[in-house]
């Protein structure tokens, strides 16, 4: 990751002139579109003929990932012309104001993509971090022009294309015969018709994400699962999906990641996953599915064996209580990451149950958890922090809690467990599930290294005294 904001504009090109021609992959955390365009634009020297143009900086780049202020036609065209070996292009912008036409992406810009025919992976995303904004100057025609040059594309991710309809998205599915990964975010005109004739295509999709696409219904999923080799299915914030969608998903034998956040599913609907799907799932998220109760735990796990599940997100479930977590602990699911933030009925009993849980007889209490997020759970008190000490949760590396409970206790816990990252300001722990599915940006859940093990073994026996003092001191004030 490279942060271009550390350099003045006139020094930026000088820095990259020193870069090795062998550099093949580059990720820049932030750069302005103007600086990038100037960097990659070929120039003609004072005594140089137009036929002898300076070769592009970074000629060997194959993978380019950029976060910019605005994705523009000029920038896209410059990248497409100048980087002749490019196979992966990932562009994300975060506008502060609504872009003018000269600082925006239009149909013309899409037409310039993949001029050298080597591009396999394309991602164009407009973030709404600062304001609600879209690629308003791109419509179905732009997608059609792009698809003509991208028939060999394997992965396409599009976010914020509010003028693109079913016609544009279907063009991608029918033109890109090698496509295996499709990601659409905030496709406000995307409907069930996009997937209506999936069985008529030659596609073998393995990764599909359609997030914030509120016109999709259960019928879309019934057609989508004709791709029986699906491994990742991200349906977050598609509010019209319900139990019938889960019933359709239940036929997928290779599904590894399923994200259903904010959907209209119920406890009984989750029971469709028991058997074929739950035994293959590695990651499951049902965050914000308001109809779910404690019964969803039994619907998923009771009577299930040899589970591969490592990551479970049951956050923001108003009807999930300690009883559900007690059942989860009883089922001995070998989870590595458990997120249950903002559950008002979750309290100290849940932490005690997880701390006491044994996945198998040869490992310690609560030994499988590397990440635990209990931020803003309504029933968490100082008592829970006693169960976050050693020897409980020996592998825990990430903990999310509410800092207002007792700052001194949190600070003492951080000092006594120096290899535990404690987040107390509502930070989301871990990474985006979509990226996790690709194993490109895996979070650091490593086992103890040799130095860490030596330090832990050498700790004195009274290491918890600070936490005891932190609990007593507030009572004496």
Per-region residue spans from a language model:
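Short amphipathic N-terminal alpha-helix
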Residues: 4-11
